[in-house]
């Protein structure tokens, strides 16, 4: 029974999800329905948490909008998500960046992760 469920979940998982980690700045384009119109809406900022659960995986993105912190949880393999683009790699040492909720301005900055050559 569980093999059948795993196979069905594997078929529904998206294959084009880029590799990103907490601390990375990402742009998530989401389909939004307003009345009878359907359009793409971009949500861009820092990934503060990732929950890896196969088909049920999710990640949390936090941004500051008009001085207010806005967090949005996205299901990684949701059909509502059109694309995920990594804009900037962040160098952090924790898996969950919930401490950014209390920080604003320059205190909430994250160093950029540089890839080693060689």
UniProtKB/Swiss-Prot annotation:
Pfam families: Ribosomal_L19. Keywords: Ribonucleoprotein, Ribosomal protein. SUPFAM superfamilies: Translation proteins SH3-like domain. One of its GO terms (molecular function) is structural constituent of ribosome. One of its GO terms (biological process) is translation. One of its GO terms (cellular component) is cytosolic large ribosomal subunit. This protein is located at the 30S-50S ribosomal subunit interface and may play a role in the structure and function of the aminoacyl-tRNA binding site. Belongs to the bacterial ribosomal protein bL19 family. This is Large ribosomal subunit protein bL19. It comes from Serratia marcescens.
